């Protein structure tokens, strides 16, 4: 199977969202192949369709003072933080055509990150039957939140590599109050090459979803 890859580098959330929408519509029309967008965002808190406002701690003004934007989205889930040092992946994938279903698709996204963490960083991570995402003990290392429109996915996953975990004090991540957050660097205790980690994400995404033709596009 064929996978297009779009590397946006450091990109504002709103701009990346517009890219997602454009590619989503093209995939729905069958004009492009399945596509994985990889991006790193400036600090932003996004609210999902079912977000509880009380899970944002502090006013919008206080967030702005700390350089954190606030953005409403149509993905599933509650509130999530994105920021530098976090690999964000937006799979624009025709789930209907693949016939795996949304539940299995989410499990595969979790599998991508669980395998990567185990085989490249010797970190044992797990999934939860209750809360989507990837966990190391009681701490979330990767968040997952999707939207599916006319059979095609958008939004996706966020893996904490060297993320500023102090910014998570401004929210209750994914609305789960009794769990914490962590990152690859926090667990290992030494710096991790972000570019290399980004390449690992692409490699394991391709492996788990059985893409054998990988093409980088603008």
Swiss-Prot record:
Sorted alphabetically, the keyword list is:
Acyltransferase, Cytoplasm, Transferase
Q: Where is this site: Lowers pKa of active site Cys?
A: 140
> Which ranges does the record mark as transmembrane?
none
Keyword Cytoplasm on entry = yes
User: Where in the sequence is the active site?
Assistant: 174 (acyl-thioester intermediate)
Work out whether the entry's keyword set contains Transmembrane helix.
no
**PROSITE patterns recorded for this chain?**
BPL_LPL_CATALYTIC, LIPB
Per UniProt, subcellular location reads as: Cytoplasm
Which GO cellular component terms, listed alphabetically, does the Swiss-Prot or TrEMBL entry include?
cytoplasm
What are the recorded GO MF terms, alphabetically?
Answer: lipoyl(octanoyl) transferase activity
> What GO biological process terms does the UniProt entry carry, in alphabetical order?
protein modification process
Q: Which residues form the BPL/LPL catalytic domain?
A: 30-213
Q: In what pathway does it function? A: Protein modification; protein lipoylation via endogenous pathway; protein N(6)-(lipoyl)lysine from octanoyl-[acyl-carrier-protein]: step 1/2
UniProt catalytic activity = octanoyl-[ACP] + L-lysyl-[protein] = N(6)-octanoyl-L-lysyl-[protein] + holo-[ACP] + H(+)
EC numbers: 2.3.1.181
Q: Which residues bind substrate?
A: 75-82, 143-145, 156-158
Q: What else is known?
A: In the reaction, the free carboxyl group of octanoic acid is attached via an amide linkage to the epsilon-amino group of a specific lysine residue of lipoyl domains of lipoate-dependent enzymes.
Which HAMAP family did the record assign?
A: LipB
Instruction: State the family it belongs to.
Output: Belongs to the LipB family.
The protein's job, in short, is: Catalyzes the transfer of endogenously produced octanoic acid from octanoyl-acyl-carrier-protein onto the lipoyl domains of lipoate-dependent enzymes. Lipoyl-ACP can also act as a substrate although octanoyl-ACP is likely to be the physiological substrate.
Q: What is this protein called?
A: Octanoyltransferase
Question: What is the species listed in this Swiss-Prot or TrEMBL entry?
Answer: Alkaliphilus metalliredigens (strain QYMF)
């Amino acid at each position: 199977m064929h996978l297009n890859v779009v590397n946006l580098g450091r990109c504002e959330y709103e701009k990346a969202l517009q890219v997602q929408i454009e590619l989503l519509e093209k995939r729905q029309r069958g004009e492009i192949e399945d596509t994985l967008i990889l991006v790193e965002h400036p600090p932003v808190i996004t609210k999902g369709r079912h977000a509880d406002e009380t899970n944002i701690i502090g006013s919008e003004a206080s967030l702005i003072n700390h350089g954190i934007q606030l953005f409403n989205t149509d993905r599933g889930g509650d509130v999530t933080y994105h920021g530098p040092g976090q690999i964000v992946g937006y799979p624009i994938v025709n789930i209907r055509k693949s016939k795996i279903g949304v539940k299995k698709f989410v499990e595969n996204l979790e599998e991508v990150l669980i395998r990567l963490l185990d085989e490249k960083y010797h970190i044992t991570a797990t999934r939860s039957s209750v809360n989507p995402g990837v966990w190391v003990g009681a701490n979330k290392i990767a968040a997952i939140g999707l939207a599916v429109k006319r059979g095609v996915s958008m939004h996706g996953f966020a893996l904490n590599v060297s993320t500023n975990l102090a910014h998570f004090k401004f929210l209750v991540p994914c609305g789960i109050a009794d769990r914490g957050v962590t990152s690859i660097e926090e667990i290992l205790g030494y710096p991790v090459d972000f570019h290399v980690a980004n390449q690992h994400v692409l490699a394991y995404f391709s492996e788990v979803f059985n893409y054998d033709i990988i093409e980088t596009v603008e």
